[in-house]
Every structure is written in C-alpha cells, then in structure tokens.
Amino acid sequence: MAIFSVYVVNKAGGLIYQWDSYSPRAEAEKTFSYPLDLLLKLHDERVLVAFGQRDGIRVGHAVLAINGMDVNGKYTADGKEVLEYPGNSANYPVSIRFGRPRLTSNEKLMLASMFHSLFAIGSQLSPEQGSSGIEMLETDTFKLHCFQTLTGIKFVVLADPRQAGIDSLLRKIYEIYSDFALKNPFYSLEMPIRCELFDQNLKLALEVAEKAGTFGPGS
C-alpha cells in the first residue's frame, strides 16, 4: 500500500501545493562492468534507458544516481555529463540507480492546469446536472482520486490501486487545509501553501493512512 502524491489545485487551475513520495520499490540499482549492456539516450533533458530491459530496469526508466551521487537531468551533482560515463572504461565498475523519471516543477504546474481543464470538461459533458466532475481515474499502477470543495479547491491524491480509504483521507486533507492554511493570518487565499503546520499535519495523516491501509472517521 502506498500514497504517491498529493496535489492542491486552486479554482483557477494553479498548483498551490504538491507532495511526492519517491518509493524505493519503483527503483532498481545495479553495478555494471565494462562495456555497459544498456543503451542510454537523452530525452527531454533526462537520460533514459532506450534498450536492455533487465533486473527490474525498464525501458523508459531514468538514471537517478551514479555511484551514489544524485543525477539532476543530464548532469551528476558534481556537474559531469551522465552520458560520458558509459564510454569510458576507467569509470567501471559503476553503480547506477534507475527509476521512473521525476517530474520537474514546470511539468507539475502544467499537469495541474491540464487536470483542471479535464475536470471542467468532464463536468460539462456529464448528462447529469450538477455533476461533481472527475472523482477517480484508474490505471494498472495507480489511482487518481479528486475531491473538489464548494469553493472550487481541488485535492488530488495519487495512490496504489489497493490503497483503501482515500475518500476519507481527501476530506482529512481538506480539514488540515482549513485549520492550518486558511486560518493562518499570513496565508493569502489561492496562493501557494507554505505553512509548516500544514506540512507536518499532512505528513502525519498520510503516515496514518498508509499504515492502516484505510483512513476512517475519527483518525
């Protein structure tokens, strides 16, 4: 069971809060000898696996770290180009960690705006008057759950398909937003949420939900 991401989108479609959990289960690390038996390529400023799927490493996975050093896009933390490593035998043996490409801040903003538009389209296309819009989208690897308040704020949770009690969790997040963001005298409505107590209570609620597998009343 796992909760992958939490997004809060304002009524204009702007992303005002996001939290991500990068699960080690979705990552694979392996030590390679020369020559590297994977084909890596640069795509959208990320180094991805193009060929050589094996041992939990999938085509489309991104290089996340080399020899324990985090990779940011196409560069390591010390400024070296990732694609320079495979062709130099002096760099071997080399330990590489792979995983799903992580979204950039701009991509998250774009996806929030896109979901806001799809939500509105879904509401308009519904044959029922007063449609609530998109409440859940399901894939083979995750479910997207959405709860929209009367004021148009959307709370979105991406979770493992087997995770139970997400509807209750969404309403708990709304309570936390009301208590620790809206009641904060320094918070401006519709603006990005930067409140320490909101962060702390949200993380606590997510931990409880993950451990229990459900999030019932009174939690």
UniProtKB/Swiss-Prot annotation:
Compartment(s) of residence: Postsynaptic cell membrane; Golgi apparatus membrane; Endoplasmic reticulum; Vesicle
Keywords linked to the UniProt accession: Cell membrane, Endoplasmic reticulum, ER-Golgi transport, Golgi apparatus, Membrane, Postsynaptic cell membrane, Synapse, Transport
InterPro entries: Longin-like_dom_sf (IPR011012), TRAPPC (IPR007233)
Record bears the keyword Endoplasmic reticulum: yes
Pfam families: Sybindin
Predominant place of localization: membrane
Cellular component, GO, one term: synaptic vesicle
One record GO biological process: endoplasmic reticulum to Golgi vesicle-mediated transport
Family: Belongs to the TRAPP small subunits family. TRAPPC4 subfamily.
Function as written in the Swiss-Prot or TrEMBL entry: Core component of the TRAPP complexes which has a function of guanine nucleotide exchange factor activity for Rab1 GTPase. Plays a role in vesicular transport from endoplasmic reticulum to Golgi and autophagy. May play a role in dendrite postsynaptic membrane trafficking.
Subunit structure, interactors included: Component of the multisubunit TRAPP (transport protein particle) complex, which includes at least TRAPPC2, TRAPPC2L, TRAPPC3, TRAPPC3L, TRAPPC4, TRAPPC5, TRAPPC8, TRAPPC9, TRAPPC10, TRAPPC11 and TRAPPC12. Interacts with SDC2.
Protein name, UniProt field: Trafficking protein particle complex subunit 4
Species whose genome carries this gene: Rattus norvegicus (Rat)
